[in-house]
């Protein structure tokens, strides 16, 4: 009988707590929710309600439960409960909105990976990814905004078009308030903490960080020890033998050119142009030119362009990093939210998923570009010419080498691109 009484008391306490809050697991996260209307009642009425529910519990336990009831709203404001309640409410609102529309880089593989990964966690929220070159989607966002049409919620891509377009137009929403999950919000989970591309540190979140091998050579035409510094590119032997992805257009050719402008200066680039550079915009043709020995050294192409030639056993290899270094990048791993997002809650859910461990595993796996998350393996990307910054750099060195922040774009890349037009047009 005594055991039965203890069991009843235990069940009674659980019943009251469950009636007031309710416990549920949403997307692998335990959340608490109210299951009674959020109405104000007197303490007396609340006590009577509790007394009826508890039906004869001892005074100490009864008044403990009164305290629990009275202070429940305060408990909901504690850090742990607050984010759980916010996450639950956001998911419910996102499900009512039904979908989130995301502008992404031009990759069918990424589109499939994002849509499948997100749907697995949130089957009641449709994630529509629209792949295109960053500038194309951003131009569409601009045109639709002028016409009062707001289709996109989130944009993921390189920073140039964002910094020169969306940011000054005032179309972006601060992103930090949208971070809800502790694993996303806590800086300790990210190499370098939270890194932003915009000067205000609010709008453009850089979730990738890596070095890209964009210097390649033909092993039959050049020995790697012959190029230990960028100054060695000015040797007479290499005149007419260096090709470069046209630095007048956005891409890794322009990024490398800008890095040279930064570390070697304008006079150096003038001398480099006098080396009779082989200019090209067709990456396949440039890769063939290096593979067949027409060019001895290539600037601006990545592993993926050379991949079929490497598989065929042709004599091309990445050049060891010159003593001045190579540029660091966040690549296409930058995310922003639009101020006019038609599905704000679904956007929050997507951003938190994207920046979670799972989301970053999906993005890095599809793009081969290393994340800054410390709990995601990125060592494997090195074999594809993408070297994770967290594996080889300090955050301080990354900031010295990076090429995608607002400051670098305005003070380095824009003037460097202008010089490219001046010298090469």
Mark where each language-model region is:
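N-terminal secretory signal peptides that target proteins for export/translocation
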Residues: 1-53
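Conserved C-terminal helix/tail region of periplasmic/extracytoplasmic solute-binding proteins
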Residues: 83, 390-425
């Amino acid at each position: 009988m005594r055991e039965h009484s203890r069991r009843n008391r235990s069940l009674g306490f659980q019943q009251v707590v469950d009636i007031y809050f309710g416990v549920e697991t949403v997307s692998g996260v335990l959340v608490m929710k109210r299951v009674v209307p959020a109405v104000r009642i007197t303490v007396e009425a609340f006590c009577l309600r509790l007394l009826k529910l508890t039906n004869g519990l001892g005074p100490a336990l009864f008044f403990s439960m009164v305290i629990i009831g009275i202070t429940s709203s305060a408990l909901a404001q504690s850090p742990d409960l607050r984010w759980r309640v916010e996450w639950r409410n956001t998911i419910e609102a996102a499900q009512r909105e039904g979908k989130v529309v995301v502008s992404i880089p031009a990759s069918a593989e990424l589109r499939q990976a994002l849509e499948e990964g997100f749907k697995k966690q949130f089957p009641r929220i449709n994630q529509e990814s629209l792949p295109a070159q960053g500038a194309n989607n951003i131009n569409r966002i601009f045109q639709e905004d002028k016409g009062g049409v707001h289709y996109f919620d989130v944009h993921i891509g390189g920073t140039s078009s964002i910094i020169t377009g969306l940011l000054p137009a005032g179309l972006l929403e601060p992103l930090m308030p949208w971070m809800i999950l502790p694993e996303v919000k806590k800086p300790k989970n990210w190499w370098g903490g939270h890194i932003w591309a915009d000067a205000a540190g609010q709008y453009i979140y850089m979730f990738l960080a890596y070095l890209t091998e964009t210097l390649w050579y033909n092993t039959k035409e050049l020995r790697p020890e012959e190029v230990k510094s960028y100054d060695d590119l000015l040797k007479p032997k290499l005149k007419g033998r260096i090709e470069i992805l046209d630095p007048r257009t956005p891409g890794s050719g322009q990024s490398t050119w800008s890095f040279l402008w930064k570390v070697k200066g304008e006079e150096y680039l003038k001398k480099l142009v006098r080396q009779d550079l082989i200019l090209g915009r067709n990456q396949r043709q440039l890769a063939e030119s290096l593979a067949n020995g027409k060019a001895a050294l290539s600037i601006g192409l990545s592993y993926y362009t050379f991949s079929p030639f490497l598989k065929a056993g042709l004599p091309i290899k990445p050049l060891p990093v010159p003593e001045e270094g190579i540029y660091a990048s966040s690549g296409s791993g930058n995310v922003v939210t639009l101020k006019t997002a038609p599905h704000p809650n679904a956007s929050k859910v997507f951003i938190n998923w994207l920046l979670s461990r799972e989301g970053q595993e999906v993005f890095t796996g599809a793009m081969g570009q290393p994340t800054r998350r410390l709990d995601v393996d990125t060592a494997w990307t090195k074999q594809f010419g993408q070297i994770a910054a967290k594996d080889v750099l300090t955050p301080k060195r990354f900031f010295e080498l990076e090429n995608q922040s607002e400051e670098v774009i305005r003070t380095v890349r824009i003037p460097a691109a202008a010089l490219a037009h001046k010298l090469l047009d």
